[in-house]
């Protein structure tokens, strides 16, 4: 068993390493964005020079890859930094959920679903869960998740809201999709879970595209 002082030193080292890693990722993201600008300029020159279609297609794929990499690094930097919530009392969770569902059917039991939430961040988290971490909503032919919102009452902890998704197109993973960090989708789900927990809530996956989130209400 390690002495307490050694354990504290190890913890401090990990914190410092985490901060340094976030800064390195941030710098790499800026470099990728710079490369994307150069590649975009090059594509414009190639278009004016009427270069062959296969060359233009190649440079287009390069730009798209640089953009995906920069976006993933942005998500990683956000996840690694402290979460700052701008809470607003009496924020309507039902409204946020309907907007985040992007046309998917949302079933509610009625009643009030107001809480002390950061509307922008919570809406982002709900949208990312509904999409299964994808950067855009699933195509119409793929179908979407079914969403249900219910209110729970407890004598000790007070009222809470339970959001249940069925049919979420979560990325393939052997473990918890909120801890996989697998590509952009995994990072978005991990950030969504962090936002939910930052509001005092819980998030867990039941498998088979079933996800549940519980959030405290006023």
Q: Positions of the model-derived regions?
A:
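Histidine phosphotransfer helical core of two-component systems
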Residues: 2-9, 13-20, 28-68
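Conserved DHp (HisKA) dimerization/phosphotransfer helix of two-component histidine kinases, i.e.
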Residues: 38, 54-103
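A short, conserved loop immediately preceding a beta-strand within the C-terminal catalytic
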Residues: 111-116, 120
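A residue-level detector for a conserved hydrophobic packing site
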Residues: 122-123, 129
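Glycine-rich/acidic phosphate-handling loop/turn and adjacent ATP-lid/helix
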Residues: 156-186
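Short alpha-helical Gxxx[C/S/T] motif in the catalytic ATP-binding
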Residues: 188, 192
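Detector for a conserved hydrophobic position within an alpha-helical segment of the HATPase_c
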Residues: 196-197
């Amino acid at each position: 068993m390690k002495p307490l002082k050694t354990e504290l030193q190890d913890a401090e080292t990990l914190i410092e390493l985490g901060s340094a890693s976030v800064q390195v990722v941030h710098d790499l993201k800026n470099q990728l964005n710079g490369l994307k600008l150069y590649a975009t300029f090059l594509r414009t020159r190639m278009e004016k020079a009427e270069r062959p279609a296969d060359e233009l297609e190649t440079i287009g794929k390069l730009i798209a890859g640089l953009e995906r990499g920069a976006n993933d690094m942005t998500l990683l930097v956000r996840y690694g930094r402290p979460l700052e919530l701008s809470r607003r009392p009496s924020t309507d969770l039902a409204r946020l959920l309907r907007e985040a569902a992007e046309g998917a059917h949302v079933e509610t039991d009625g009643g009030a679903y107001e809480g002390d939430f950061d509307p922008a961040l919570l809406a982002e988290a709900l949208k990312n869960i509904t999409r299964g971490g994808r950067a855009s909503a699933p195509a119409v032919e793929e179908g979407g998740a079914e969403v249900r919102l219910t209110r729970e009452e407890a004598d000790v902890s007070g009222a809470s809201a339970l959001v249940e998704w069925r049919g979420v197109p979560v990325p393939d993973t052997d473990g918890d999709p909120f801890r996989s960090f697998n590509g952009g989708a995994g990072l978005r789900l991990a950030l969504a879970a962090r936002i939910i927990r930052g509001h005092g809530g819980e998030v867990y996956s039941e498998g088979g595209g079933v996800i549940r989130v519980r959030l405290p209400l006023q």
